[in-house]
Design a protein with these regions (language model features):
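C-terminal regulatory/interaction module of P-loop NTP-utilizing enzymes
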Residues: 1-367
Length: 367
């Protein structure tokens, strides 16, 4: 357990995670109050990484539940090992036959077999999934419930007992209560609103893209091999790309990847040509690439003209109405694109909120 907020910052920094005062305070309170932590924000700002680093910093085992649409409780809580149950019935056929051998009628035989039902629906045949495993674990764990907003609302209801009391009820067996409360971290990309009942049970943290100074500090801490001067320029370029109307804004991890890419190529000067040749490291959709190519010259030099060569070498030309963006249908939107569309966040473009004073309580910047 951490002794202070500063202790949290130092422990996370020791694992390569740069945390500001607000983030460190929230994590400190989570560990002291034994409350789940819900982290919301755009993709790629370090929500999942925080859970991993917390596990490493506290020397706890990490259990992860990756949420997805259509997920049911058998994949999250527990399920019965039917194969094992069937195997036992085959092995115990003779014993079962003895139990019903002197039964005078079918009803009596069924009653006798039913009396043994608890044997087959016992802890012996219970297959734990991440949520139940976190409760039953004898060692301290960090439970990461990743992208809870991707799951159906029914799964949220299943989580309430765990989040509120650190226990899981199995009707056939009973209630399992954690002997050592897990550190529970839930993440959400805000593709939908979460239930108020779930939020009430959690501490809340909003993670946004960090300020330029902090993002530069993060890039430096990763030993990318890029000089400070080039790293500073690169961070400014990435922040400029995030201001564009892109389907997916560049994440912090992609900024780091871009820095490493430029270092591997031995780049000693940033220019629009170099950046355009490597922009696919941070821009992953064809239409976004074209927008980025148009913007890169002015992001490097506001007075620069756009060289025609920047538009060449990024795939063959398309006829009218044709695009590499196969995820889009005739209406120009796919299910995933709809979930990640610009404007999902109340303050503006997805991952690029309106500029507000740093003291605003609703938009703390941290990584």
């Amino acid at each position: 357990m951490f002794d202070s907020v500063q202790d949290v910052r130092e422990a996370l920094a020791g694992e390569g995670y740069i945390a500001d005062e607000h983030l460190a305070t929230t994590v400190f309170l989570q560990t002291r109050l034994d409350k789940p932590l819900l982290i919301e924000g755009p993709a790629g700002v370090g929500k999942t990484e925080l859970a991993k680093v917390l596990a490493a910093a506290t020397d706890r085992r990490l259990l992860r539940l990756q949420c997805y649409e259509g997920q049911d409780e058998t994949k999250a809580l527990y399920e019965w090992d039917y194969g094992k149950q069937l195997l036992y019935t085959q092995i115990l056929r003779e014993k079962i036959a003895q139990i019903v051998s002197d039964a005078t009628d079918l009803e009596t035989a069924v009653e006798r077999i039913g009396a043994q039902e608890s044997v087959f629906f016992s802890d012996r045949f219970l297959a734990s999934r991440p949520l139940l495993e976190a409760v039953r674990s004898e060692e301290p764990v960090v439970l990461l419930i990743d992208e809870i907003d991707r799951a159906d609302e029914a799964l949220e209801a299943v989580l309430l007992e765990l989040l509120g009391e650190y226990q899981v009820s199995v009707p056939e067996v009973g209630t399992f209560t954690a002997t050592c409360a897990p550190y529970v971290v839930l993440t959400s990309n805000n593709t939908r609103d979460l239930a108020a009942a779930l939020k009430r049970r959690c501490l809340h943290l909003f993670l946004d893209y960090p300020a330029a100074e902090r993002e530069l500090e993060i890039v430096r801490s990763k030993d990318t091999g890029l000089t400070d001067a080039l790293a500073t320029q690169l961070v400014d370029v990435v922040r400029g790309l995030r201001e564009l109307d892109l389907r997916k804004a560049p994440s912090i991890s992609e900024t780091i990847d871009w820095a490493r890419t430029l270092a591997v190529l031995g780049v000693d000067e940033l220019n629009a040509k170099v950046l355009s040749d490597t922009v696919s490291v941070v821009v992953k959709y064809d239409k976004d690439v074209h927008k980025a190519l148009d913007a890169l010259p002015r992001l490097v030099d506001p007075n620069a003209a756009v060289p025609e060569s920047l538009h060449n070498g990024h795939g063959h030309s398309h006829g009218p109405g044709h695009s590499h963006d196969h995820d889009h249908g005739p209406d120009g939107k796919a299910v995933r694109a709809e979930k990640d569309r610009p404007g999902r966040f109340a303050d503006g473009y997805y991952g690029t909120p309106k500029k507000t004073p740093s003291s605003s309580p609703g938009r703390r910047r941290a990584f």
